[in-house]
């Protein structure tokens, strides 16, 4: 039994083994079995896709699920501290899947709990299972994770999905990674210092769009701007439009962790590069296999 706090809790070989097991699950050659297990989904921050996909993943493997989707539904709203909540949850479940607004909260929970903790998003720090889904999608599309050219577009400072992706790529030797964002939303220096592959920071996706194998888009977060006019200006300038995508190679891929707001023109959905709904379809099978490996893999 293990915790999943960061993508770097896995080795390269462990990630590839997880992906191979997910392949077998999708082809009918493997079925995760969690009969008699209980999964607690502790979402102190609102979530739709992640919470529901973990619930579906657990149920499809035969586990029971209990949990909450807001701290307002818990004793935290009465002043209970996180450590006490985690100690209570592990009395009820065999694994805790947790999302929390504070950076480092998942690591703290894992230190408190004797049962495994899976990080479903901790503040702006990481979202490891989303990165696993993203990289699984890339592998399915390209047949490899090595030597590819990636672009990350949008909010690269606060998007925890981007942090996890940049970290997981240290295991797979990309050709180059382009970081495309407004100056105020550049990737944080401490993240860049961890990277062992070529990186170039840009402000316009059009400069490199024809080179990309994978374009990973994130939404510009309104809550990060004090000036509403500045937000609207930045949001519109980082909106992926139909004409820009027409300049991409047909075999390249656009990914997005979702939810999408207005950062991808909806006309792009029918273009061959649009792979974000395919990406989302892999969430339940991969998380089902991951839950099996966390709770029953040994």
From Swiss-Prot:
The keyword Transferase applies. One of its GO terms (biological process) is 'de novo' pyrimidine nucleobase biosynthetic process. Carbamoyl phosphate binds at residues 49-50, 99, 127, 130, 258-259. Disulfide bonds: none annotated. InterPro entries: Asp/Orn_carbamoyltranf_P-bd, Asp/Orn_carbamoylTrfase, Asp/Orn_carbamoylTrfase_sf, Asp_carbamoyltransf, Asp_carbamoyltransf_Asp/Orn-bd. It holds the Pfam family OTCace. Its EC number is 2.1.3.2. L-aspartate binds at residues 78, 160, 219. SUPFAM superfamilies: Aspartate/ornithine carbamoyltransferase. Belongs to the aspartate/ornithine carbamoyltransferase superfamily. ATCase family. NCBIfam families: asp_carb_tr, PRK00856.1. Catalyzes the condensation of carbamoyl phosphate and aspartate to form carbamoyl aspartate and inorganic phosphate, the committed step in the de novo pyrimidine nucleotide biosynthesis pathway. This is Aspartate carbamoyltransferase catalytic subunit. The lineage of its organism: Archaea, Thermoproteota, Thermoprotei, Sulfolobales, Sulfolobaceae. The gene is pyrB.
């Amino acid at each position: 039994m293990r915790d999943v706090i960061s993508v770097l809790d896995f080795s390269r070989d462990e990630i590839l083994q997880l992906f191979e097991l997910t392949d077998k699950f999708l082809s009918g050659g493997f079925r995760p079995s969690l009969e008699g297990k209980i999964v607690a989904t502790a979402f102190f921050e609102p979530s739709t896709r992640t919470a529901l996909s973990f619930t579906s993943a657990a149920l499809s493997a035969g586990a029971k699920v209990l949990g909450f989707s807001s701290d307002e539904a818990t004793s935290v709203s009465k002043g209970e501290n996180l450590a006490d909540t985690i100690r209570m949850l592990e009395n009820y479940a065999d694994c805790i899947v947790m999302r929390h607004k504070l950076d480092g909260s998942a690591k703290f929970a894992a230190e408190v709990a004797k049962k495994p903790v899976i990080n479903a998003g901790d503040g702006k720090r990481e979202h490891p299972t989303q990165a696993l889904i993203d990289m699984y999608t890339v592998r399915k599309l390209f047949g490899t994770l090595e030597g590819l050219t990636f672009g990350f577009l949008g909010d690269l400072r606060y998007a925890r999905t981007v942090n996890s992706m940049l970290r997981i790529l240290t295991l797979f030797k990309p050709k180059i990674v382009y970081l495309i964002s407004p100056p105020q939303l550049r990737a944080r220096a401490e993240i860049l210092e961890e990277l062992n592959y070529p990186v170039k920071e840009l402000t316009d996706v059009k400069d490199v769009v024809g080179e990309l194998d994978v374009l990973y888009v994130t939404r510009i977060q309104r809550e990060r701007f004090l000036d509403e006019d500045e937000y609207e200006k930045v949001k519109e300038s980082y909106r992926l439009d139909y004409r820009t995508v027409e300049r991409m190679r047909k075999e390249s891929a656009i990914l997005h962790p979702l939810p999408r707001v207005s950062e991808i023109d909806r006309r792009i959905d029918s273009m061959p590069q649009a792979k974000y709904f395919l990406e989302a379809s892999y969430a339940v099978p991969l998380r089902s296999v991951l839950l099996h490996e966390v709770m029953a893999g040994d």
